Amino acid sequence: MLLRRVMKHVRDQNWFAVALDFMIVILGVFIGLQVNTWNAERQVRAGEQRYLERLREDVAVSIEQNEWRVAFMDRQDKYSTLALNRLSSCVVPPEDRDVVANAFFHVGKSLPPVLLRGVINELNATGNFQTIRNSALREAITKAIETIETSDLIFNNVLMRGTPHVVYVESQLEYLKSGPRSGAVDIAWRDIAFDLDALCADQGFRRALSAARAYTNDMQNHVTVALEQQHALLQIIDAELAK
């Protein structure tokens, strides 16, 4: 219909009408392209929103796990410190016995920081990392990953250096309770046997317990750093989702 109208205007030599027809065509094409562009951008933004929501969930779970790890290692530091004090005096009051038993039971237990990377790995694998427009957010994600990878290397080193001390401490103990047991669950004084007088006189035992505590504290520091980064990352994500 439009073509017939243009041809009629040409035959009539109505050049103004011809120009107007062409402007209508050009404007229609432009609007069509613009609508397609807007639709594509809206789809990209919707995809970014979904990624951010899933990423937020991963980071929130990571924070929860790391907070537990910090608390666990902080508790172990307190247990070990009290146990070392009691070994120095060679007296363990009844109210401290379970704490001392758990200082020995949990000796050297440390955990590296964690970051759930399901969404991050998906973004990298699909080439959609740039879908996240906020460069500060992309940088925060990259730094969080680098911290985890560095901490994993340090954890392996700490584990290797701390193992001889842990082995020595445990060689002086006898566990009386059999059966499966979670490594994070406390035991009772009655679940473990040792010669208190011998341990008090054994300077090597105290040094091994102290060294294991130091290595656990080292990993606790790395988890704390990662935790602070992840809290900051979560704030950036929340700010993006609020836009």
Which residues does each predicted region cover?
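Hydrophobic membrane-insertion alpha-helices, especially the h-region
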Residues: 20-34
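Long, hydrophobic alpha-helical segments that serve as membrane-spanning/inserting helices
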Residues: 1-16, 30, 37-243
